UniProtKB/Swiss-Prot annotation:
Substrate binds at residues 11-16. Belongs to the IPP transferase family. ATP binds at residues 9-16. The keyword Membrane does not apply. SUPFAM superfamilies: P-loop containing nucleoside triphosphate hydrolases. This is tRNA dimethylallyltransferase. Residues 34-37 are annotated as: Interaction with substrate tRNA. One of its GO terms (biological process) is tRNA modification. GO terms for molecular function: ATP binding; tRNA dimethylallyltransferase activity. Keywords: ATP-binding, Magnesium, Nucleotide-binding, Transferase, tRNA processing.
């Protein structure tokens, strides 16, 4: 069986380029592990690889959904596993590329999700928020999970609803479940290579600042405006992701363009820091520095590792 390769790391570190180069070298196909790139019409703000950047490599879970369609970790787990099996059945190498931490954990660890009930629970708490307000929602979490309530600000309603949902699905406080998932890292199968890309923080931040400027220059604000003109609600989850929510602030006159750029860059840097914290917690990740080691050297190292893995598995 062909190995499974997973490439993770913070935004702007070079995951896409390495994934495509590796796929070209190993006869691989790519599965996106990104929670926003899965949506059609959200291209610039999600840093979705263009057709040219995809390098004639088949990509899965890009442009799979309309912006108004919900997409859960459980759905990702199912669809990504189906893609992995399909790719391996044809003698190709599946390569998962992405920075959404829980998506990646759902593939390599035995996370089990309730097949029914999650959407109805979320709908209940969303309606509760509309009727009772965010303070009341936060109080409900405090009753069930004081630690999570302490950690989450009342304004962070998306995460509060997620915590309440997990409390009901698991029967345990989300803080307890979260802690167990963070600390429990079972050994990877011998056919799985878990690669992390990093760089010095100042280099990552410099790349992020430049990328944010490039996104705005490429039409991020216009892309967001077109989605609103097409009738999509600004409250949709993908439109509340980094980049799109900042463009909305500008479009609705809440901030000037320079202020939008400043907070867009700041929030993206904070997001990258959280991504690094998440992935560095996992001792199974094999790290490569994209600043001190160029792409060719990293690529050669990974090709050698994969060849050795394939020999052992066979």
């Amino acid at each position: 069986m062909k190995p499974l390769i997973i490439i993770v790391g913070p935004t702007a570190v070079g995951k896409t380029a390495l994934g495509v180069a590796l796929a070209q070298a190993l006869q691989g196909e790519i599965i996106s592990g990104d929670s926003v790139q899965v949506y059609r019409k959200l291209d610039i703000g999600s840093a979705k690889p263009t057709l040219a950047e995809q390098g004639n490599i088949p990509h899965y879970l890009l442009d799979a959904l309309e912006p108004a369609e919900p997409f859960t970790v459980a759905q990702f787990q199912t669809l990504a596993n189906q893609a992995i099996q399909d790719i391996q059945s044809r003698g190709k190498v599946p390569i998962v590329v992405g920075g959404t931490g829980l998506y990646i954990r759902s593939l390599i660890d035995p996370f089990q999700f309730a097949e029914h009930g999650s959407e109805s629970i979320r709908s209940f708490w969303t309606a509760f928020l509309s009727e009772q307000g965010k303070e009341a929602l936060h109080q409900e979490l405090a009753k069930r999970d004081p630690l999570s309530a302490q950690r989450l600000h009342p304004n962070d309603t998306v995460r509060i609803i997620r915590a309440l949902e997990m409390c009901q699905l698991t029967g345990k406080p989300f803080s307890e479940t979260r802690g167990n998932q963070d600390l429990n890292y079972p050994p990877l199968p011998p056919s799985t290579l878990y690669v992390g890309l990093t760089a010095p923080r100042e280099i990552i931040y410099e790349r992020i600042n430049r990328r944010c400027e490039q996104m705005v220059a490429a039409g991020l604000i216009e892309e967001t405006h077109n989605l609103i003109k097409e009738g999509y609600s600004p409250k949709l989850k993908p439109l509340q992701s980094i980049g799109y929510r900042h463009a909305l602030l500008y479009l609705y006159g809440k901030v000037t363009l320079p202020e939008m750029m400043r907070i867009f860059q700041r929030d993206t840097r904070h997001f990258a820091k959280r991504q690094l914290t998440w992935f560095r917690r996992d001792p199974r990740v094999v790290w490569y520095d994209t600043y001190s080691g160029n792409l060719t050297n990293i690529l050669e190292s990974l090709i050698g590792t994969c060849s050795g893995m394939e020999s052992r598995v066979e």
